């Protein structure tokens, strides 16, 4: 479940560990053992670094001022200011990840962890970290909140240390030259081969002592679209070259399967991932939508980090994982007079202390290596027991214990002091009031949003078409009563300047049709514009996703296909969020026509002659129009108020003229003792001549449970509708059993105020992981009385 989060973390080289109960499954000795084994393997061939030729250097700078500013920034980046001797700061850190299956759906918090600590650093003694508060919540799986057994390596960032990487790239230690194995640093020596530089805006401000600080922007664009390259806006102090603020993002998203193929080819490795694995876990992408960094001036001289944040998303097959890391720092003093105790030096590694020879382990026999492995494990067990005894002795005398370790490739020795009662960390008054609070003031959200505006459509990688990528898999495969079995191939190519092209040919067997899409897109990492042509099978349903893989399983296995379909071909211009949700719009011109049922085959049909329901008779015509949709989630705390809103509007003219709009709202609230309740209210109205394929339908898992969609039953289809749903549930670990009652109506808009008897149903269900999966056993009340079982994804509650 956490693979998508880890994929995104890998994309920008951040180590994010989320433990659900229990202790870490690795010790220092096991790490030494792993490193030792790794030393025994053949090293892969290194990725070649592009040399900076005179031609590349000449084309790297738009003007001489950009060249001069980059040179100054490089020197400042590696220069250590010996005048900065110490600081005393409070550090806040928050890491959040969500999880969903649809581009449009409720924002679900998969996990959130946060901590606050006092960090005192001195050039002579390293960093002393007093952990003041720490807590983790996993609201989708209640009772698994992990607030104990804190790992000091995962706690509290260090605001500054000699050699710190100012741009938050890599392992935290600045490298003077570009490393082609990592994200290519835009300020490192040799970056001219990968980037182009231009001077941007400039600003200045006056300090209280009358000193004027001048800042200048350096706009950096990669020469080609590649996930290892970033686009960004970087501001520097003109007098010193120190970084003051920055905003950057990946130039394009990371296609993880493409990266795997590239690494396999680089290593001359024939052991490629099986095609079946790719099909099951595709697509697999990660996108770093934006990193913002803000520095503050302290003592009139020292630029120190004040706030930094990274935001992105990952997709692994059907899973969508938005991700955010936020850090902020507040300084009580800089170059204060407080003294810090000396931190003990790092102990000698077990490998060196036990076998202090220079012999490479590949040069010794297999029997000798096995003997050494066992000796390392035994020595590590002894060391671990000694550490436990020392910790117990500290807790018995002071109520706190201190652990010592090295961070950032041994650059900084760190002492972390924390209370022995780990539950006290979760109750700390130093933490924000609620872990579910957005933290606008704490993490400087307004300033971050202002910085992100610089990453607009004008800041893009250069024009350099890349090799196309090919994607197939379960997410492109479906089954329904019109197409039968249908699958497609997704072909994409990055062109540069923010442009890309995408083709998706699709074949279906039952109706013997060839459909497809051809689109050109332009994006800036957060928003995307698409222009293209298409020939599609469309679903009329406003709720649920009848053409998804999950709905296809119901159709294939149980003969249950709740979608109503029609065909269309045309062209459209659309705008959307890259990560899904939020505000989307679409301008279209298309021809629509009927899509008759072409197959009755399903497993239920083969075993018990279960028949699919008939499809609607679509009205043929050509129209042009516009539609918009906006979804938003307010609140993340399952025990507090949460509101999911989904609003839609559409208008078209041509063969038939119409306008339609709908609003869907679900309000939920924890009632205490693990009980939760939710109420849904939804309604839609239309004007003009609404064709059958754009009407509303009542019945099914996403509207009134206990009733199947119907084109003939009263109150189940029309040019207006209303819907109400109520649920009461009790939360257990990962599962929320519920009881529910649904009522709704669809019909002629003139009958809105006197609809007659509405459609209704009631039942019991189970919501897994806060509605990510859902199973309902329902009983129809009106018009049909029958018992139905529904299994589906992405429920409202």
Outline where the language-model segments fall.
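Short loop/turn motifs that connect adjacent beta-strands in outer-membrane beta-barrel proteins
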Residues: 81-83, 208-212, 444-452, 458-468, ...
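Solvent-exposed loop/turn segments connecting transmembrane beta-strands
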Residues: 226-229, 476-487, 494-498, 503-516, ...
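C-terminal outer-membrane beta-barrel translocator/porin domains of Gram-negative envelope proteins
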Residues: 149-160, 165-176, 453-458, 477, ...
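Structured extracytoplasmic
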Residues: 15-231, 250-260, 267-278, 287-289, ...
């Amino acid at each position: 479940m956490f693979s998508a989060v880890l994929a995104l973390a890998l994309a920008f080289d951040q180590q994010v560990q989320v433990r659900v109960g229990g202790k870490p499954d690795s010790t220092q000795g096991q790490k030494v053992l792993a490193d030792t084994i790794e030393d025994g393997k053949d090293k892969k061939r290194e990725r070649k670094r592009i040399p900076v030729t005179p031609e590349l250097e000449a084309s790297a700078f738009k003007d001489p001022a950009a060249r001069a500013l980059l040179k100054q920034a490089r020197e400042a980046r590696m220069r250590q200011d010996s005048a900065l001797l110490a600081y005393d700061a409070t550090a806040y850190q928050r890491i959040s990840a969500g999880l969903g299956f649809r581009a449009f759906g409720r924002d679900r918090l998969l996990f959130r962890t946060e901590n606050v600590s006092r960090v005192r650093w001195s050039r002579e003694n390293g960093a002393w970290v007093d952990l003041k508060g720490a807590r983790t919540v996993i609201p989708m799986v209640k009772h698994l909140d992990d607030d104990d057994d804190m790992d000091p390596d995962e706690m509290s960032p260090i605001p500054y240390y000699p050699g710190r990487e100012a741009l938050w790239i890599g392992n935290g230690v600045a490298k003077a030259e570009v490393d082609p194995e990592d994200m290519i640093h835009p300020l490192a020596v040799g970056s001219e081969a990968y980037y182009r530089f231009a001077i941007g805006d400039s600003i200045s401000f006056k300090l209280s002592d009358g000193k004027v600080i001048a800042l200048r922007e350096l706009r950096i664009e990669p020469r080609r679209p590649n996930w290892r390259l970033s686009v960004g806006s970087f501001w520097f102090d003109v007098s010193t070259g120190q970084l003051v603020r920055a905003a950057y993002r990946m130039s394009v998203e990371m296609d993880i399967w493409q990266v795997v193929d590239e690494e396999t080819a680089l290593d001359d490795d024939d052991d490629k991932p099986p095609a079946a694995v790719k099909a099951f876990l595709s697509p697999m992408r990660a996108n770093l939508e934006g990193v913002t960094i803000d520095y503050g001036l302290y003592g009139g001289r020292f630029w120190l980090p004040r706030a930094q944040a990274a935001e992105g998303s990952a997709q692994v097959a059907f899973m969508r994982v938005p991700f955010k890391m936020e850090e902020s720092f507040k300084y009580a003093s800089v170059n204060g007079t407080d003294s810090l105790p000396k931190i003990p030096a790092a102990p000698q590694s077990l490998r060196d202390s036990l076998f202090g020879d220079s012999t490479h382990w590949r040069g010794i026999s297999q029997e000798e290596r096995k003997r050494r492995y066992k000796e390392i494990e035994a020595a590590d067990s002894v060391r671990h027991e000694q550490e436990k005894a020392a910790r117990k002795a500290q807790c018995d005398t002071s109520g706190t214990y201190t652990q010592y370790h090295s961070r950032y490739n041994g650059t900084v020795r760190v002492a972390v002091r924390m209370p022995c009662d780990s539950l006290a960390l979760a109750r700390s008054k130093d933490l924000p009031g609620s872990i579910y609070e957005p933290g606008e003031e704490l993490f400087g959200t307004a300033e971050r949003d202002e910085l992100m505006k610089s990453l607009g459509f004008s800041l893009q990688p250069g024009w350099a078409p890349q090799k196309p990528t090919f994607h197939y898999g379960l997410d492109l495969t479906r089954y329904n009563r019109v197409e039968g079995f249908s699958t497609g191939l997704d072909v994409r190519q990055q062109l540069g300047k923010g442009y890309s092209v995408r083709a998706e040919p699709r074949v279906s067997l039952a109706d013997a049709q060839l459909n497809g899409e051809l689109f050109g897109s332009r994006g800036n990492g957060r928003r995307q514009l698409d222009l293209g042509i298409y020939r599609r099978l469309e679903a009329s349903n406003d709720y649920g996703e009848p053409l998804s893989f999950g709905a296809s399983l119901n159709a294939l296995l149980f003969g249950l296909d709740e979608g109503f379909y029609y065909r269309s071909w045309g062209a459209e211009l659309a705008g959307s969020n890259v990560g899904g949700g939020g505000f989307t719009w679409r301008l279209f011109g298309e021809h629509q026509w009927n899509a008759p049922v072409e197959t009755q085959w399903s497993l239920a049909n083969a075993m018990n002659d279960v028949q699919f329901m008939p499809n609607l008779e679509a009205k043929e015509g050509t129209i042009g129009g516009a539609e918009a949709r906006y979804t938003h989630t307010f609140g993340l705390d399952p025990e507090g108020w949460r509101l999911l809103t989904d609003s839609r509007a559409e208008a078209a003219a041509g063969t038939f003229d119409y306008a339609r709009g709908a609003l869907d709202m679900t309000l939920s609230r924890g009632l205490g003792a693990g009980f939760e309740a939710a109420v849904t209210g939804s309604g839609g109205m239309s004007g003009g001549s609404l064709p059958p394929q754009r009407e509303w339908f009542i019945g099914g898992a996403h509207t009134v449970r206990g009733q199947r969609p119907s084109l003939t039953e009263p109150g189940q289809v029309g040019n207006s509708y209303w819907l109400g749903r109520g649920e009461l549930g009790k939360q257990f670990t990962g599962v929320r059993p519920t009881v529910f009652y649904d009522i709704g109506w669809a019909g002629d808009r003139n009958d809105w105020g006197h609809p007659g008897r509405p459609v209704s149903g009631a039942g019991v269900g189970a919501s897994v992981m806060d509605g990510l999966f859902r199973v309902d056993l329902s009983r129809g009340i009106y018009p049909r009385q029958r018992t139905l079982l529904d299994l589906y994804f992405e429920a409202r509650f």
